[in-house]
Amino acid sequence: MVVKNFSDGTVVEIDRGRFDDWCIYIAGTCNRHAPKDVAYFTVVRGFGKRYGVDKVYADFISIYDKTSKSLDRSVLDHIETLSKDYGEYSNKFAIVFTIIYLGMVAEENKVGTRLGKRIKRLGIHQVLYDRYSPTAAANFSRGLPWTRIDNECKLRGF
């Protein structure tokens, strides 16, 4: 299912993946592929350096707070509105934060989840505030019990 077409020809889709029906794909201007956490964490870190971590995190939280188990077109519109603050990078912001939003919806729909969208928030927090590299943040939770990740989230206030 096409979620959004962007002005540069990029298309963001949701389709069946290996585990569920919530696999996110980028298509249009490139070979269709599922974006990796490290790729969008790298972009988020770059936005933090350019626009300030507090602004980028606040914009992320405004999306996070609106995220539920359902895809909501008003959240996509909200992302588009936020993107206007990012000047020449507005399209890149809209694409990356649409992907992050869909990732959070997917996490909320994951069978048996105890962490839901907080797992994405932890990664964003780690790259913006905790000085984790995008690779370290993307790999942080792999193999950890959910209780440890839950504690890491709680230590950061969420």
PLM region spans:
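Non-catalytic substrate-recognition and accessory regions of acyl/acetyltransferase enzymes
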Residues: 1-158
